[in-house]
Amino acid sequence: MNFNLAKYTAIAAVTIMSFSCNDKAKEAETSEAETVAVSETTGIDFTVDTTSSKIEWKGFKPTSHHFGTVSIDEGSFKVNNGTIESGMFIIDMNSIAVNDLEGNRKANLENHLMGTVEGKEGDFFNVREYPTATFEITEFSKGDDGKTLLSGNLNLKGKKNNITIPVNINENGENVVLESEPFTIDRTKWDVNFGSKSIFDNLGDNFINDDIELKITINANKA
């Protein structure tokens, strides 16, 4: 009975892990940085409402994960006839929050991610050297499935790459809400290498997935 129980438990665990892999968000198309979009019309200016804008994140290990948020520091868009023609926003990397832990465990992980722990500054985001990240729009387009695709240069930890992600945009003349579908980026493309099995070959099962899942919500009001 014990053997059978162990066998079925193992099968169940593999099944759950398989479902988890299948549910993983799609990786953003990533390429070299591109020319930033410039509005060619007299569009309307919108300013990002930082109190209602955020980036949600998830990080994964083989048997667990953590999640939290990062705040938007400032940003603006230029909109013409309901279309965002150009824009950017700045991400406050000092605002990294872990939402699935409490007390010392929460504080310890937040400090490690931000790089405020002596000797571990460069493990993740090193906010003392790189206190902000930026996203600058380069293009809006339509995918083969009809979804709106947003492309932009993500400058993170001093490394700039262009990413393309599916988004939903709602505009009513006074307010614009831009919300991405969940997507992942390969953190090593921005030199966030700590615990990466693709960078270090001696980690065994003690590694952190390269993929970080993100979901962006930007709320902007007419300036």
Regions found by a protein language model. Name each.
Residues 1-19:
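Sec-dependent bacterial lipoprotein signal peptides
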Residues 21-223:
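Low-complexity, acidic/polar, glycine-enriched regions of mature
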